[in-house]
From Swiss-Prot:
Cofactor: [4Fe-4S] cluster
Protein residues bound to [4Fe-4S] cluster: 577, 580, 585
Pfam family, one: ThiC_Rad_SAM
Protein species of origin: Shewanella halifaxensis (strain HAW-EB4)
Protein name per Swiss-Prot or TrEMBL: Phosphomethylpyrimidine synthase
Key words, A-Z: 4Fe-4S, Iron, Iron-sulfur, Lyase, Metal-binding, S-adenosyl-L-methionine, Thiamine biosynthesis, Zinc
Length: 662
């Protein structure tokens, strides 16, 4: 069997046998909202107790409460869920949409292309089997979350988000876990706690979006904005030369397991329409697309043959399928294209290069820019959010922050204000390849030019010397720009610039970017961000190995790395690891020092010995003569040498050997 067939067969087997997957020692829980049908899915990580005293026969333990964390996996992490990818996920938002009374179910699809696909019997074997007619706003109605927010309405989606973003912070009362630095937010104002009203205000202001198409009721509400947790997007999608529908559905499920807050389907190969339907119906997270890719397929890949009519039909096709946000390269203007001529790497955005070629071949202004108000009308009818694409982003650090890049950003700032006139939720896409010293300028200019609309960046990649490791080179920039105020990061995988990512690449990219996003949250001072860090640090200091693994982003890898060096069962409770060994573990030594100090204090209290303060000890030391100090040091030195000049002695060695023999 060829590698391609084998990969496809494995993907088919995966989705045929798909069962909910849970991380070790975790369970799916639901936090109840103000109404019966508002239940917010979270992951709860259970921890072992801490030994605080007693003896071998009567140990005394202190409980470590379970930790609640954000969970993007929807039904895929719920053992009680009945998953069938051929039927799709439960449409749990359907009732919320219907009860608002401002949408209607159409008799059939509106897109001419979709009508052609449905009439083609040759596609029956590929088609998602449980298709329903799409919804659209009633005449003269706007159905966007931005519209509701501006009307002062707190939707169920907004309440869901508030509960989710807080991560049960109010339940955590251990000062060890709640301690945090106030952070440096660079002007971001984060609610503490985050309330439904705060969510509404941020959406109404345009500082945050809730990307939820009315035709994607399976999606769980989430928010993108700099005053909330930094989000991460994963890219999937087939191409003309590789991947299949089965593989893309597998990658979707895999992405949500490892923390993708949104997923972009960047398919460019055959069966784009059918692949997208399977993805949306099985996605608990918002789905984004770049519609120009499919429009180009419809004109046989010839950019010059693109036109507004084809693109418009593509927007309606995708909106009625349930796409939650469109990337639109409307800022690539004819007059900006010559600005890229002296660049080292020219135009590297696929969508940007398509529109640049169209502009030059027709010597006309970008038709996406010319028809931008028409695009907004379509988006407003389905609550599709706009992600204004950065077609002029730099493809090398040599081209960073140049005239072309910032000219386009200025235009995007103008377009976002037009979108807001139509109550269309909008975010701004950013670079790209930017050295560390130029990253903050990008964030500052975006906030200024785009009136604080959320920023969504690809990296940025901070150096160009590491093909195969660009998840690292870009993760550095991603952490920095997340701290400065970026709302969502688009992941980069190890295959960036080299090939289409597989499952393992997707995982590596997501873990890298979840680290970057979390580091940004901690640095900004997000109220609930550092709790998980503190819990893991406490587990590490107390040598609760299983809790260390399970509180981390990737428990399986952490456990495998530890067991690779110390596979014995006894090593899972030992107070050292293979890095330093039993004699040089700094945390073990610290614990021994603490125990010694505590025992000494108890002895002094028992014997009525006056316990001096640090200042009193210093006063005594100051009164000693130099000769007295030297004599004391000499005596201690002689005692150390008499015992063999060993840092650790037989008792500690015997204790360690006993642990390893268990």
């Amino acid at each position: 069997m060829s590698n391609r067939r084998e990969t496809r067969a494995q993907a088919q087997q995966f989705i045929d046998n798909l069962k909910p997957l849970q991380h070790p020692n975790s369970e799916k829980i639901y936090l109840q909202g103000s109404r019966a049908d508002l239940k917010v899915g979270m992951r709860q990580i259970h921890q072992a107790d801490t030994l605080i005293g007693g003896n071998e026969t009567n140990p005394v333990f202190e409980a470590n409460p379970p930790l609640k964390v954000y969970d993007c996996a929807g039904a895929y992490s719920d053992p009680d869920a009945n998953i069938d990818v051929r039927k799709g996920l439960e449409k749990f938002r359907e009732h919320w949409i219907e009860e608002r009374g401002d949408t209607e179910q159409l008799a059939g699809v509106s897109s001419g292309f979709t009508q052609q696909r449905l009439a083609d019997d040759g596609l029956d074997h590929l088609r998602f089997e449980s298709l329903l007619p799409p919804r659209r706003a009633k005449t003269a109605k706007r159905v966007t979350q931005l519209h509701y927010a501006r009307q002062g309405i707190i939707t169920p989606e907004m309440e869901y988000i508030a509960i989710r973003e807080n991560m049960a912070l109010a339940e955590v009362n251990d000062p060890i876990l709640t301690q945090k630095d106030k952070g440096e937010s660079f002007g971001a104002v984060i609610g503490e706690p985050i309330t439904p009203e705060f969510v509404r205000q941020e959406v109404a202001r345009g500082r945050a979006i809730i990307p939820l198409n009315i035709n994607h009721p399976e999606a769980e509400p989430m928010i993108i904005g700099r005053n909330f947790l930094v989000k991460v997007n994963a890219n999937i999608g087939n191409s003309a030369v590789t991947s299949s529908i089965e593989e893309e559905v597998e990658k979707l499920v895999w992405s949500t397991r490892w923390g993708a807050d949104t997923v972009m389907d960047l398919s460019t190969g055959r069966y784009i329409h059918e692949t997208r339907e399977w993805i949306i119906r099985n996605s608990p997270v918002p789905i984004g697309t770049v519609p120009i890719y499919q429009a180009l397929e419809k004109v046989n890949g010839i950019a010059e043959d693109l036109n507004w009519e084809t693109f418009r039909d593509t927007l309606i096709e995708q909106a009625e399928q349930g796409v939650d946000y469109f990337t639109i390269h409307a800022g690539v203007l004819l007059r900006y294209v010559p600005m890229t001529a002296k660049r080292l790497t020219g135009i590297v955005s696929r969508g940007g290069s398509i529109m640049a070629k169209w502009c030059l071949s027709h010597h006309k202004e970008n038709f996406l820019y010319e028809h931008f108000r028409d695009i907004c009308e379509i988006c407003a009818a389905y609550d599709v959010s706009l992600s204004l694409g950065d077609g002029m982003r730099p493809g090398s650090i040599a081209d960073a922050n140049d005239e072309a890049q910032f000219s386009e950003l200025t235009t995007l700032g103008e377009l976002v204000k037009i979108a807001w006139q139509y109550d269309v939720q909008t975010i701004i896409e950013g670079p790209g390849h930017i050295p560390m010293n130029l990253i903050k300028e990008n964030m500052d200019k975006q906030l200024e030019l785009c009136d604080e609309a959320p920023f969504y960046t690809l990296g940025p990649q901070t150096t160009d010397i590491a093909p195969g490791y660009d998840h690292f080179t870009s993760g550095i920039g991603a952490a920095m720009i997340a701290w400065y105020g970026c709302a969502m990061l688009c992941y980069v995988t190890p295959k960036e610039h080299l090939g289409l990512p597989n499952k393992e690449d997707v995982k590596q990219g997501l873990i890298t970017y979840k680290i970057a996003a979390h580091a940004g949250d901690v640095a900004k001072g997000h109220p609930s961000a550092q709790i998980r860090d503190n819990a893991l640090s406490k587990a590490r200091f107390e040598f609760r190995w299983e809790d260390q693994y399970n509180l981390g982003l990737d428990p399986d890898t952490a456990r495998a790395y530890h067991d690779e060096s110390l596979p014995q069962e006894s090593a899972k409770v030992a107070h050292f690891c293979s890095m330093c060994g039993p004699k040089f573990c700094s945390m073990k030594i610290t614990q021994e020092v603490r125990d010694y100090a505590a025992a000494k204090e108890r002895d002094e209290l028992a014997n009525n010995i006056d316990i001096k303060s640090d200042a009193e000890y210093q006063s005594c030391a100051d009164s000693e003569t130099t000769s007295e100090r030297e004599l004391g040091m000499a005596q201690m030195s002689a005692e150390f040498k008499a015992k063999g000049a060993e840092l650790y002695h037989e008792a500690a060695d015997k204790q360690r050997d006993a642990v390893l023999e268990d």
